[in-house]
C-alpha cells in the first residue's frame, strides 16, 4: 500500500501542476496558441518555440501527456495489487484510479473540442469542470491509499451533522471555483467589479458579466463563513483531530484567497496575482473535498487499517493483576476480565461470569 500511496501522490502533484498551468493558459489568453490544431501544434508535436502563447499552450499539452502517464501508472500498480486489502472492491484504490484515467481521457478530449470550437467560454468551463472532477478523484485515491490522514480517520466516527456540513462546504467550493473559471473567461466578467469588497460600477461592462462576478464573490464569502462554522463546531465536539485540522487548513486557504482577491482588484488584475488566485482556488477545492471525503469514511472501516492482533490465551495465563504473576492462572484471568476498563468492554453475561469465578476462587 505504501507504493500505491506514492504513485497516488505523484499523480496528485502532476494533476495540480496541470490545473494551475491550465489557469495560466486562460489568464494569458494562450488557449489558441497552437491555432485550431490538436493534438499537434501547427502540424508538429515539437513546434518551434518562437511565441509566448505557443510556449504556454504546448507546455500545457505536454503536462497533460505526463498526467495521463502518471494516472495509467497508478492504475497498473493498483491492478497488480488488486488482491491486497483496500485495493480491489468497493472503496478500493483500483476503482478510483480507473475512474481517474477515464476522467483524464475525457479532459483531453474536451480540450480538443475546446480548441476546435475556438476556445469559447462554455466549452472552456466544461473542460475546467471535468478537470476539477479529476483532481477530486485523485485526492480520493490518495486517501483510499492511506494518505492525507485517510488511515487514521477511519478509526474514529464523526456525526452525521459533520458529514453534511463538510459536503455542503465542498459543494460551495466547487461552485465558487467553476464560477471563478467562468469569470476569468466570460467577456468583461473579470473587470466587472473594479472595487473590493464592494463591487463598484464599470459602465463598459454588461449586466451579465456583473452578475457572474458577484455570484463568484458571494459564493466565496459564504464558503469562508461556512468553513469558519465547521471549525468552531469541530473544536466544540472534539470528534476527530484530523477532521479539525483539515477544516482549519481549508479555512486558512479561504481567508488567503480573499486577501489575494482584494490585492488583485486593488492592483488592477496583474497576471501573477490572477494566476495565484486560480492556484489558491484549486487548493481550496482540494482541501474542502478532502475534508468531506475524510468525514465520509470516518469510522466506516473501509480501506487500510493497522492490523489488530488479538491476545493469545497463553499471554493471559500467569499475567496476574497489577503486573504480578499468579499461581492460579484461571483466577488471574477472571480478575483481569472483571476489572476491564471501558476501552475493552465485556458483555453483561461475560462480566457476571468473570465476577462469579473470581469470588468462587476466593472461597
What are these regions (language model features)?
Residues 1-330, 334-336, 343, 353-363:
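Polytopic transmembrane helical bundles with strong interfacial aromatic enrichment
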Amino acid at each position: 500500500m505504501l507504493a500505491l500511496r506514492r504513485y497516488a501522490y505523484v499523480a496528485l502533484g502532476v494533476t495540480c501542476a496541470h490545473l494551475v498551468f491550465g489557469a495560466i493558459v486562460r489568464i494569458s489568453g494562450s488557449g489558441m496558441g497552437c491555432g485550431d490544431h490538436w493534438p499537434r501544434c501547427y502540424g508538429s508535436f515539437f513546434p518551434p518555440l518562437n511565441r509566448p502563447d505557443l510556449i504556454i499552450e504546448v507546455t500545457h499539452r505536454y503536462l497533460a501527456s505526463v498526467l495521463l502517464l502518471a494516472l495509467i501508472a497508478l492504475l497498473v500498480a493498483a491492478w497488480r495489487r488488486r488482491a491486497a486489502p483496500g485495493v480491489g472492491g468497493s472503496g478500493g484504490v483500483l476503482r478510483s484510479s480507473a475512474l481517474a484515467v477515464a476522467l483524464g481521457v475525457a479532459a483531453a478530449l474536451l480540450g480538443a473540442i475546446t480548441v476546435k470550437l475556438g476556445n469559447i467560454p462554455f466549452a472552456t468551463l466544461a473542460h475546467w469542470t471535468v478537470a476539477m472532477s479529476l483532481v477530486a478523484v485523485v485526492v480520493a485515491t490518495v486517501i483510499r491509499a492511506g494518505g492525507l490522514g485517510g488511515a487514521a480517520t477511519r478509526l474514529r466516527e464523526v456525526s452525521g451533522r459533520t458529514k453534511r456540513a463538510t459536503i455542503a462546504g465542498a459543494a460551495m467550493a466547487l461552485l465558487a471555483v467553476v464560477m471563478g473559471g467562468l469569470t476569468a473567461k466570460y467577456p468583461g466578467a473579470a473587470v466587472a467589479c473594479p472595487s473590493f469588497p464592494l463591487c463598484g460600477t464599470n459602465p463598459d461592462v454588461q449586466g451579465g458579466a456583473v452578475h457572474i462576478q458577484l455570484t463568484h464573490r458571494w459564493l466565496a464569502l459564504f464558503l469562508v463563513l461556512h468553513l469558519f462554522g465547521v471549525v468552531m463546531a469541530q473544536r466544540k465536539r472534539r470528534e476527530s483531530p484530523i477532521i479539525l485540522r483539515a477544516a482549519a487548513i481549508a479555512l486558512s486557504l479561504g481567508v488567503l484567497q480573499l486577501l489575494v482577491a482584494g490585492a488583485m482588484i486593488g492592483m488592477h488584475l496583474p497576471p501573477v496575482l490572477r494566476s495565484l488566485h486560480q492556484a489558491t482556488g484549486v487548493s481550496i477545492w482540494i482541501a474542502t473535498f478532502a475534508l468531506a471525503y475524510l468525514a465520509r469514511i470516518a469510522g466506516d472501516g473501509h480501506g487500510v487499517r493497522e492490523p489488530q492482533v488479538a491476545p493469545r490465551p497463553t499471554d493471559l495465563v500467569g499475567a496476574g493483576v497489577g503486573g504480578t504473576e499468579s499461581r492460579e492462572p484461571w483466577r488471574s484471568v477472571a480478575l483481569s476480565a472483571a476489572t476491564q476498563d471501558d476501552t475493552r468492554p465485556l458483555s453483561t453475561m461475560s462480566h457476571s461470569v468473570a465476577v462469579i469465578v473470581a469470588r468462587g476462587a476466593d472461597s
